[in-house]
């Protein structure tokens, strides 16, 4: 029952205003479909008839229109994928007393009941062939439910309760049509809630990602979108590489003959390249490894054994005396020699100014076991630093032990000067740059020497050493031009301007003379043999024997060329002429190389080295044996007899000694 004071409906027991929806659902679950046109028409006719009977005035039209509006405002049933079902709309009998009532409230109540009865829910049944009616939003717009009253025709109450179109759509979308009218208070609360500004939803865990995707998509579609940097172009495949094929079971069995041949050829090429690389590596190393292994294997013998039991003790003593002579004559600088010899002229009214004695800085390329340490200790000008370099590690260890023995006083033979400071390093002096040695860097080395260097460096630059010595070693550098130039670059880089380069090596003039003599004798023998056999026909298959080897020597030394040297003895090109040298108790068939002297001297000019001295060993003895310093030194070293003055060497040792010569270059 509708209560005007509360503007709401109240239910009572037995009241027919109870919802017809519940009664239809409980009493008649299965209904027969009735078209909506008939339903609206029937309800419209009954309502119009009742209104005409009770109110023949125009106000009756308002009630009928309200009923039609309420029926149209009901939402359409949603469609599904199942076939449309048949539903029946059943009207409950209308109470005549309610229609004849003159009270407007009862009239309104009766109209509301009729509208509720007409909007009974339609239940789905299977097997229906009639389509379910759908509401057309274009033809029937959604409108709020308004119950007509007698005063609506003047526009007083209906206008006040009517909602805005936006509110009507929002209200119908938010909740379904109620079974009964909503109270005014509830409608006001719903209106305020809808008009209230909706708060921002709290961000979720994926809000930032979704926002970035949305913004990035919008930016890409915009006109000002700027693309990222382009990726680098893909690398083109190697022409030799074939596209990778898929691996399938049994694919190897389907390999063709062409693929097998290609694989075999590639394998052979790889093996050939490995062999060539190994050969190049061995050739680049040359005889350095062989020489190092040989000198590492030579046992260390004492001084007493060399003087008493050695078979070549005379040759050993003579070689040491020649090296001492070279050190005594050319290790001091010009100022020291002028002061020592008294050849420098001073002012008449003044004496010799007191000058602090300058000490030498010496680097020895191929120091060996340190056999020359005592010779440098007896040098006329004292030595401040001695640096010994040698590729044989064992020899470096033995040289360091010998130096430590000299420092401790063992083997002191009345030396005049205090022992100098010495440093020993294992280093290939001819195949590598000496600038990598720490002590050489500290003293100083010039990397700009030689061809291609700066003019200012060659004029004013230079290293920090006074003397560079190389005793019986430079013939290992003539394996190739690169090694020879590297050796001279190390020498010139270490020397300061005015420095001396001392050394001894095999005499190429002796080698050339020997080769020419041997070739001449061989030609004479061949001519004699050809003359003797000219009358006799050679037997079938007989070949004249000619090994082509050139060698000479005696019981204590031997020189052998593995290949035929030039007949005239002139070695062209000047590098790579290898021979094997044997020396009793010293050298066991070690490969060495010819040092063509004129080619070597021309090469030194490229490194600002000027030749000052060069003599064979026997000529040095002839010129220096009567020197007041070197003559007595030869007697003390056992080279000459103290009584007779005879050279204490055999003829074989003299022949072996004649194979070498000494030299000295100045750095200009």
Swiss-Prot record:
One of its GO terms (cellular component) is nucleus. GO terms for biological process: 7-methylguanosine mRNA capping. Pfam families: mRNA_G-N7_MeTrfase. Transmembrane segments: none annotated. The keyword Oxidoreductase does not apply. Residues 73-88 have a biased composition (Low complexity). PANTHER family: MRNA CAP GUANINE-N7 METHYLTRANSFERASE, MRNA GUANINE-7- METHYLTRANSFERASE. This is mRNA cap guanine-N(7) methyltransferase. It comes from Aspergillus fumigatus (strain ATCC MYA-4609 / CBS 101355 / FGSC A1100 / Af293). The gene is abd1.
């Amino acid at each position: 029952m509708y209560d005007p004071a509360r503007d709401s409906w109240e239910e009572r027991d037995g009241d027919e205003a109870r919802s017809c929806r519940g009664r239809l659902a409980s009493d008649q679950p299965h209904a027969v479909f009735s078209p909506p046109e008939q339903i609206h028409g029937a309800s419209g006719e009954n309502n119009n008839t009742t209104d005409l009977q009770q109110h023949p005035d125009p106000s009756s039209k308002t009630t009928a229109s309200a009923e039609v509006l309420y029926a149209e405002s009901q939402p359409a049933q949603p469609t599904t994928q199942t076939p449309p079902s048949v539903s029946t709309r059943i009207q409950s009998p209308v109470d005549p007393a309610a229609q004849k009532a003159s009270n407007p409230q009862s009239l309104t109540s009766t109209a509301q009941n009729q509208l509720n009865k007409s909007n009974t829910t339609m239940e789905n049944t299977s097997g229906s062939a009639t389509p379910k009616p759908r509401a057309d939003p274009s033809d029937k717009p959604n409108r709020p439910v308004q119950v007509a009253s007698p005063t609506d025709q003047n526009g007083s109450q209906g206008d006040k309760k009517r909602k805005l179109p936006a509110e009507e759509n929002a209200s119908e979308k938010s909740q379904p049509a109620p079974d009964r009218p909503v109270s005014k208070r509830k409608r006001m609360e719903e209106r305020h809630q809808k008009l209230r500004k909706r708060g921002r939803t709290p961000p979720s865990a994926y809000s930032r990602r979704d926002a970035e995707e949305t913004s990035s998509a919008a930016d890409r579609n915009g006109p000002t979108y700027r693309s990222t940097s382009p990726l680098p172009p893909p690398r083109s495949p190697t022409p030799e590489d074939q596209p990778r094929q898929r691996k399938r079971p049994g694919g190897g069995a389907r390999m063709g003959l062409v693929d097998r041949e290609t694989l075999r050829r590639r394998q052979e090429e790889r093996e050939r390249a490995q062999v060539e690389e190994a050969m190049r590596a061995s050739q680049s190393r040359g005889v350095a490894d062989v020489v190092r292994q040989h000198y590492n294997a030579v046992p260390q013998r004492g001084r007493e054994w060399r003087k008493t039991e050695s078979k070549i003790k005379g040759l050993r003593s003579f070689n040491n005396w020649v090296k001492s002579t070279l050190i005594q004559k050319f290790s001091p600088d010009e100022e020291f020699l002028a002061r020592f010899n008294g050849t420098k002229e001073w002012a008449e009214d003044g004496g010799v100014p007191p000058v602090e004695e300058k000490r030498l800085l010496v680097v020895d390329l191929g120091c060996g076991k340190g056999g020359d340490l005592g010779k440098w200790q007896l040098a006329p000008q004292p030595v401040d630093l001695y640096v010994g370099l040698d590729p044989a590690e064992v020899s470096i260890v033995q040289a360091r032990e010998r130096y430590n023995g000299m420092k401790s006083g063992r083997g002191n033979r009345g030396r005049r000067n205090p022992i100098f400071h010495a440093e020993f390093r294992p280093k290939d002096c001819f195949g590598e740059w000496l600038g990598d040695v720490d002590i050489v860097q500290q003293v100083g080395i010039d990397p700009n020497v030689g061809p291609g260097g700066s003019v200012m460096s060659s004029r004013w630059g230079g290293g920090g050493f006074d003397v560079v010595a190389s005793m019986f070693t430079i013939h290992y550098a003539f394996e190739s031009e690169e090694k020879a130039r590297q050796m001279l670059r190390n020498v010139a880089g270490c020397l300061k301007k005015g420095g001396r380069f001392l050394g001894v090596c095999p005499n190429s003039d002796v080698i050339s003379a020997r080769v020419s003599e041997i070739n001449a004798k061989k030609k004479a023998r061949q001519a004699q043999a050809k003359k003797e056999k000219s009358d006799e026909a050679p037997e079938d298959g007989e070949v004249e024997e000619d090994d082509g080897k050139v060698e000479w020597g005696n019981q204590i030394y031997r020189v052998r060329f593995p290949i035929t040297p030039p007949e005239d003895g002139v070695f062209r090109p000047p590098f790579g002429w290898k021979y094997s040298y044997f020396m009793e108790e010293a050298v066991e068939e070690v490969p060495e190389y010819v040092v063509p002297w004129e080619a070597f001297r021309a090469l030194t000019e490229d490194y600002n080295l000027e030749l000052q001295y060069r003599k064979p060993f026997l000529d040095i003895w002839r010129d220096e044996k009567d020197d007041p310093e070197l003559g007595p030194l030869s007697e003390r070293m056992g080279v000459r007899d103290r009584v007779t003055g005879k050279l204490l060497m055999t003829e074989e040792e003299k022949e072996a000694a004649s194979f070498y010569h000494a030299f000295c270059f100045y750095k200009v």
